[in-house]
Structures are given as structure tokens and as C-alpha cells.
Amino acid sequence: MVIDSVARDLEGKIASGTATVAVVGLGYVGLPLALNLVRGGYSVIGLDIDREKVKALQAGRSYLRDVPAGELQASLATDRLAATSDPSALAEADAVFICVPTPFTVQKEPDTTYIARAAEDIAAHGREGQLVILRSTSYPGTTQEVVQPILERRGRRVGIDIFLAFAPERIDPGNAPLPADQIPVVVGGCEADSTRLAMLLFSRLTRRVVPVSSPAAAEMTKLLENVFRNVNIALVNQVTQLCDRMGLDVWEVIDAAETKPYGFMSFKPGLVGGHCIPVDPYYLSWKAREFDFHMDFIELAARVNDAMPYYVVNKLMTTLHDNGGSNGHERVAVLGVAFKKDVDDARHSPAIKVIELLRKRKIEVAYHDPYIPTLQVNGDLFDSEALTDELLQTADCVLILADHSCFDYELIVRKARMVFDARNGTRNVTMGREKIVRL
């Protein structure tokens, strides 16, 4: 049969490692995936609309902290990695990954514009016999409601002429507890051949591939993982605020609770940021309304976390007042504006909101972050300042918002007048603890 022939031809290329794989979107998800595919033996075409990224890759320069230049250069040396901004290169691919951003609107509704554009490029420049795998996190149904109709506009049929699946990314920027090949991959295809082909492709990249019944099941899996984290962080954030009122140290309480050998999973309080954890609850609650279902619990957790910048600023202002400040002429030095420790990404960083709120209180703000050279807050561009004695000593308070591993916390506490630590980065500092205020 023709149907079997199309799938069988693609299966042979994937199984033998002779398939050419395209990755659309070379950011925090796409670029590491492209290098993993090269290590898996595939020839890879990286596609991105950002020409500066493409030029950097072609020159062997990495723009991501998690991707060492040496690793990129080693992949280029194999002659199996190319980068381009020309979507016509998609015609050469046997499989195509979509790894583009999925932001939400100001109304906190999903924006699938980038996914749709990627699908349109594949539809226009792709061909029969391709496998398309969406990796971008979105609401359950995106693969079949957004991507599939676009791919089928030109008469190609999913499951017959082309194949389509969803496989959520599971990277943890700034933290690599496991090698990529030890992290299981969940795959849900639109039909059996799509699932089987996607599983076969991933089998060269990871030791375990987990099939689920549909793309929507795989999409829901990803949201469950991230919403689980969001909800539990919200829980501990509320406990933190109660401990504050009761005069208790929430970090002491958490450390004690962690000694229970079963039934307790430790989550740390603080600001929530990035392009997944604070966004994904809204994807899920938006989709739920289509089914006349309201995710009250999840929405409440999201609101709790969204309000944490206000809590941090209010507590900081109280601390300044209690220490003789709060006269409208204070200077705060913010350390770390990335959305989490050890990453070079400020998208959806809670530090932006904190700085905005401080400036509304007439606080002069300077920041230092070795990974974020510039930061835009309400249209104003800030430059990262050097971490000097002057920066620390002239600030009324040093505010730690991202506890980067490279920071010398002993030095920071020694030089600063006061330290407000929103991340518990100073937990191992022994001298000068009377200067430290924690959540």
C-alpha cells in the first residue's frame, strides 16, 4: 500500500540514522535539541528567523550559557549541523521539530502565533513523507487544533502523507541533574504511525521513550508537570507569609519538614519566573473554560505567585523603615535579575516587576547580573553594573533576586549595610548574619 510505503521509507531513514532533521527555533529548547540530534547521528538543519543567532552558530559562537562553545564547535566539525534563516531548507528534512516560543497575551490567553508561523513554513516548503514534532509547551489540543489544519491545507493528510506528534521538552535551564539521554521523553502522535516514528527518532537520543494515546495527552502531561510545581510553590509562599506574621523562620520549618522520609516533597518559597512555570497555569485554565470547567485552585495558586513581587517589595520597605531608611532617597542594589539562578534568561523574570515597584516608591535601583548585561523595565534600559565594593557599600540594601552560584555571598554580606535575601542564597554565610533579612 502507498500508506505503508511512505511510513516505511521514513522509518528506514530514521532507524539507520540517515534522516535529515530540521529544528525550527534555536533558543533554549531548540539549540540543545539540535546538538543532541547530531550526537544521535542525524544530519541537522537549524532554522531561526534571528539572523544574528544564525551567524553566531555558523561561526561556532554559542549565545546560551547552557551550550558551551566547544560543544557547538564539535557538532559543526562533524559537518552534520547547519544553520539558516531560509525556510526553503525545510524541503531537505525528513523530520521537523517545532521549538518556538509560546507566550500569552495581556489577557493571559495563549498566543500560538509562532507555532502557526512555523507550521505555515513547513506546509509551504515541506514535502510528503515528513514527520513533524511539536515541542513548544501549549494548551492540550494545540497540535491537532493549530498545527494539523495548517499542515493539511495543501492536501497532505496526517497519518497518510505526513506524520505529526507532540513531545514536550523537559529541560531545566541552569540545572542539569541528569544527562539528556537519561531524561525520558513522552510522545503522543495523531495516530499509530506518527507515534511509532516519533518514538523511533527519540530512541537514538534517550534511553526511555514513553508513548501516550494522543498529542493532547502529551500536552496535558507537560502542563501537569509544570502546574504541579506552580501550585506547590504557591503553597509554600503562603506558608512563608504566615510564618512572617508569626515570627517564625520558614526556612527552618522547611529544613525540618525535609527530614520526613516519605510523603513530603520540598519546595522553596520565592519569586516565580521564566517562560513555563508562571505561564502554564493560564494555558490550562483557558482551555478548561472551553469545557465549562473552572480551575479555581490552579488559578488561585497562580495569583499567589504573581503577587510575590508585591510581598517582597512591601517587606523590603518595612525593613528599610525599621532600619532608619524609607525617606524617599534610598538606593537598592539588586543582585541577579535572571528568572532563576545560573541562567542568562530574563523572560518573565519577577525581578522586572520588583524593580518597577521599587521605582514607583522613588527608590533608586542599580543591578548586577553577570548573565544579563542589559534589562528593560517599562521602556527604560538598565545596564548591569560591576559588582564592586562601591555598589555594595553605597546601597541602603542589597536585594538578592537570583542566587547565582558565582556570587561570593560572604563578601556581599561583609560589604553591604543590609541584605534582603529573597532566595536564601546566603544560607551558608556565618559572619554578619544580623545584616540579613530573608523571606
Question: Language-model features: where?
Answer:
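Structural/interface elements that position substrates and couple domains in central-metabolism enzymes
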Residues: 1-439
